[in-house]
């Protein structure tokens, strides 16, 4: 990623997983700022769950930063037998230990639960004491000073893995609620029903400021941003603050939704970034007033609307999907694959073309974003055939790895 490097914008190493069919999806570190008081901990290991295989790969990124190596594999069959959980998704460290949201039970049915690992990556058991009336799992984020965790909903692995069927939304097989937990007691205590405004409420983010109770959720199918906060009376409130309109398409029987599959907040809590995977745009909003976001930047790349079919000389298959921001808020790296079966359904050409990663240059002082013309990684050119890219992490820290106590 250094423009002065002779291998700028190139793949310099590939680490093959030992199994087949893992589908590496999200990932997270073994340590973050929440274990600042434990001198034995360092950000050395990256945990890569296989959402299909249920295997969790622990990768050593520190011994040789240019050639990460496999440290350990936590077997998915062992996880199932010890916890009755499958479908590993979001990884967060908790002090020196690790919590991973699991989207299903051993048979792939919802709601799943939370896997608890110790710092040696041994299975402790299930983290939660109860799932209450929660129907589905997906993402989670916590604010320890307020003793709160928020979790969101996708669907059961058996529902989302084969592909997306709109009728299953109507059959209530996809989520439309977010949940507030008593973090210390490890039990859900309040549910917010978002209804049509919150279909497929995927990523959830609190402000980085540990004193803040403001947080945000991107509802993928509704293409809305939901804002929540705790009011002066101590009650949790929510509102819809961003609504991306569906767009007409000549080949679609209905207007195309944006499919806002990810959101991100800059480290200073000033900007919120979101994607519209089917439309093909990335957006930047100033959220200095979290009740009234202001659109400050927009970049087009791929998507179904045909506004930017080619980026830096590479034909795009897919749209902006996952993204990660540098700590200084200036470099936003964006990838294009959502989930293999969903990719194949909406962007079938990705099978032959593979995914890409691009860099968007952001202006944290004045707002605004522009596509970097010098950087693109074309994973369609991989030696073992076209590959797809999902989540990115920065070894030195990024904007979704740390939770402050």
Spans of features found by a protein language model:
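Beta-propeller domains
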Residues: 1-41, 47-75, 109-110, 118-121, 130-137, 141-290
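Surface-exposed loop and turn segments in beta-propeller and other repeat-based domains
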Residues: 12-29, 71-84, 127-135, 188-199, ...
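Structural signature of eukaryotic scaffold interfaces centered on beta-propeller domains
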Residues: 23-43, 84-94, 141-147, 203-211, ...
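Asp-box/WD-like beta-propeller blade repeats and closely related beta-sheet repeat scaffolds
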Residues: 61-144
């Amino acid at each position: 990623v250094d423009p002065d490097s002779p291998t700028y914008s190139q793949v310099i190493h590939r680490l093959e997983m030992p199994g087949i069919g893992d589908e590496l999806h999200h990932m997270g570190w073994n340590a973050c700022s929440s274990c600042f008081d434990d001198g034995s901990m360092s950000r050395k290991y990256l945990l890569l769950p296989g959402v299909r295989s249920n295997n969790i790969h622990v990768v050593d990124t520190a011994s040789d930063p240019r050639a990460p190596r496999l440290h350990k594999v936590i077997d998915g069959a062992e996880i199932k037998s010890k916890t009755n959980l499958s479908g590993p998704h979001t990884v967060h460290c908790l002090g020196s230990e690790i919590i991973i949201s699991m989207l299903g039970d051993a048979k792939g049915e919802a709601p799943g639960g939370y896997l608890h690992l110790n710092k040696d990556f041994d299975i402790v058991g299930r983290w939660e004491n109860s799932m209450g009336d929660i129907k589905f799992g997906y993402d989670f984020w916590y604010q320890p000073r307020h003793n709160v965790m928020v979790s969101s909903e996708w669907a059961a692995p058996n529902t989302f893995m084969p592909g997306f069927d709109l009728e299953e939304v109507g059959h209530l097989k996809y989520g439309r609620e977010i949940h507030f937990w008593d973090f210390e007691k490890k039990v859900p205590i309040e549910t917010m029903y978002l209804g049509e405004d919150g279909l497929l409420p995927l990523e959830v983010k609190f402000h980085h400021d540990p004193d803040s109770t403001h947080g945000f959720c991107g509802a993928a199918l509704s293409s809305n941003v939901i804002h929540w906060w705790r009011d002066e009376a101590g009650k949790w409130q929510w509102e819809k603050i961003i609504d991306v309109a569906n767009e007409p398409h000549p080949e679609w029987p209905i207007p195309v939704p944006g499919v806002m599959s990810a959101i991100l907040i800059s480290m200073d809590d000033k900007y919120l970034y979101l994607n519209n995977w089917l439309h093909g745009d990335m957006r930047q909003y100033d959220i200095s007033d979290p009740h009234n976001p202001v659109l400050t930047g927009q970049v087009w790349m791929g998507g179904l609307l045909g506004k930017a079919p080619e980026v830096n000389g590479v034909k795009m298959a897919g749209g902006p999907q996952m993204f990660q921001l540098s700590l200084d808020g200036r470099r936003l790296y964006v990838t294009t694959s959502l989930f293999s079966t969903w990719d194949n359904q909406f962007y079938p050409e990705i099978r032959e073309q593979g995914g890409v990663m691009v860099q968007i240059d952001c202006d944290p002082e004045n707002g605004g974003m522009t596509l970097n013309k010098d950087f693109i990684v074309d994973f369609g050119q991989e030696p073992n055939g076209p590959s797809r890219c999902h989540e990115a992490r920065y070894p030195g820290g990024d904007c979704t790895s740390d939770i402050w106590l």
